């Protein structure tokens, strides 16, 4: 018999909100009787944007901004119907992107 697995990938700009959301998901899945692996921290994407400070000249004067995207991975092995139902009803904060694969 093949094992069923739900893979949840979480993305957010703020790592504190991301860790709270991951902890809620793990707690909900364990409470409903499923085996949970994670949260596994994935590499953080860092995007750097360089812009000119001045509008017209002074090309040597530049400013850099960066945007970090933090990611976590959670695997739920052999989920019960109660697990899926509890995860559907779970209320997570805005700012967290959730990608679910069955």
From Swiss-Prot:
Keywords: Ribonucleoprotein, Ribosomal protein. GO terms for biological process: translation. The keyword Ribosomal protein applies. The keyword Ribonucleoprotein applies. Signal peptide: none annotated. Transmembrane segments: none annotated. Pfam families: Ribosomal_S10. Gene3D superfamilies: Ribosomal protein S10 domain. PANTHER family: 30S RIBOSOMAL PROTEIN S10 FAMILY MEMBER. Belongs to the universal ribosomal protein uS10 family. Involved in the binding of tRNA to the ribosomes. Part of the 30S ribosomal subunit. This is Small ribosomal subunit protein uS10. The lineage of its organism: Bacteria, Bacillati, Bacillota, Bacilli, Bacillales. The gene is rpsJ.
